[in-house]
Amino acid sequence: FFRIDKTNPPVDKKMDFLPIKKTPENLSKMIKSACYDCHSNETVYPWYANVQPFGWFLKDHIDEGRRELNFSTFATYEPLRQAKKLNKAAKEVKEGEMPLESYLLMHKEAKLNQEQKELLVTYLLTMKDITMMQNGISEEELKPKQK
């Protein structure tokens, strides 16, 4: 069987969401345990990544997660994209869509209780609001484009 490539791309802390937003330690720990395995270049691959076809599924999932939102490269996003990503992340956490149930089955430490969810959602929305204010972005600009 072929193994997946578990090499993480290099991480530049000057581009990473947590340090650039000066995220408080309690929130940093929460975000790292609930989000970073799929949404950063700091993935810690579990043992079952070596078992196929689970490894292939996992690698696909991580690649997709990084494409959608990569906290390790957050500073490279244009301000409007940052605001949109933060808004979407807050919505998905609030609605229980993130972290994924399939991830939580094997990663109990990533499960957020209601208080943690509310704290994380508030933080993400606050960072979104600050980004919008600092860059003159309107609520209208956050809305998806009509086709």
Give short role names for the model-derived ranges:
Residues C35-W47, P79, L142:
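Juxtamembrane/interfacial segments around transmembrane helices
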Residues L69-T73, P99-K147:
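Flexible coil segments in periplasmic/lumen-exposed cytochrome c-class electron-transfer proteins
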Residues P9-I31:
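Electrostatic cytochrome c docking/interface patches
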Residues K22, N26, M30, P53, ...:
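Extracytoplasmic/secreted proteins, especially bacterial periplasmic and envelope-associated proteins
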Residues Y45-D60, E140:
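Acidic helix-start/capping segments at beta-turn-to-alpha-helix junctions
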Residues W56-M106:
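Extracytoplasmic electron-transfer domains, predominantly the class I c-type cytochrome c fold
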Residues I31-T43, M98, L120:
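The canonical Cys-X-X-Cys-His
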Residues F1-P9:
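Membrane-interface motif at the C-terminal end of an N-terminal transmembrane signal
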